[in-house]
A protein has these predicted regions:
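Catalytic cores of nucleotide-sugar-dependent glycosyltransferases that transfer UDP/GDP/TDP-activated
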Residues: 1-191
């Protein structure tokens, strides 16, 4: 988004960048500027797209976008911290004025336990009687011992570090010493 390069008809177009996983930044040798974009290295010397001597396409996109959103308000805040931002926390803080989080999640009407036909028994805030049957069915399906008084901790997520799996792994041994059961559902990296 360089006003010296864009045609007049494109100058009024506004852009929104959605950050799903800041770990994937599009880092390349600066030679890519010529190979892919037909630009000389001098074009990037203003610091917009270079980071640690490499082209960083995500950094450039964040700086040039009119608005940046993340997949949740929590993730938007996490992106301003070193732990989650994978070295782009300074850029994210600098662009905080245009950063927001858009919450995604389940459809609470479709997956309402009071009416869901796909669970063992229905329940609601006013009538919790079916909840124990659902817990027993989950324990049966996952091969856990059916222990009615032991809490089940559930995690449904992509199984990658930026979703917190590394944090769970750090404390997993301690968690398993507690009177609890853990159910994890998701796809992710083989490690």
């Amino acid at each position: 988004k360089d006003d010296g390069v864009r045609e007049d008809r494109f100058r009024s177009i506004r852009t929104v960048l959605s950050v799903h996983n800041i770990e994937y930044q599009g880092r390349y040798n600066p030679q890519v500027l010529g190979d892919l974009f037909g630009l000389d290295h001098g074009w990037a010397d203003d610091g917009t797209i270079l980071m640690d001597g490499d082209v960083n396409l995500l950094k450039g996109a964040i700086l040039c976008a009119d608005a940046v959103n993340a997949v949740s308000p929590t993730y938007a805040n996490e992106l301003k911290t070193p732990y989650f931002a994978h070295r782009l926390d300074g850029i994210m803080r600098r662009c905080g004025y245009k950063l927001s989080g858009v919450l995604n999640g389940i459809d609470i009407k479709r997956y309402d336990p009071a009416t869901d036909p796909h669970i063992a028994a229905n329940y609601s805030v006013g009538d919790m009687s079916g909840k124990q049957a659902d817990k027993a069915e989950l324990q049966r399906l996952t091969g856990l011992r059916q222990e009615p008084y032991v809490p089940i901790v559930g995690m449904v997520s992509r199984l990658v570090s930026h979703k917190g799996l590394d944090l769970v792994c750090e404390v997993l041994h301690d968690m398993m010493e507690l009177p609890m059961q853990l159910v994890v559902l998701g796809k992710g990296d083989r490690k």
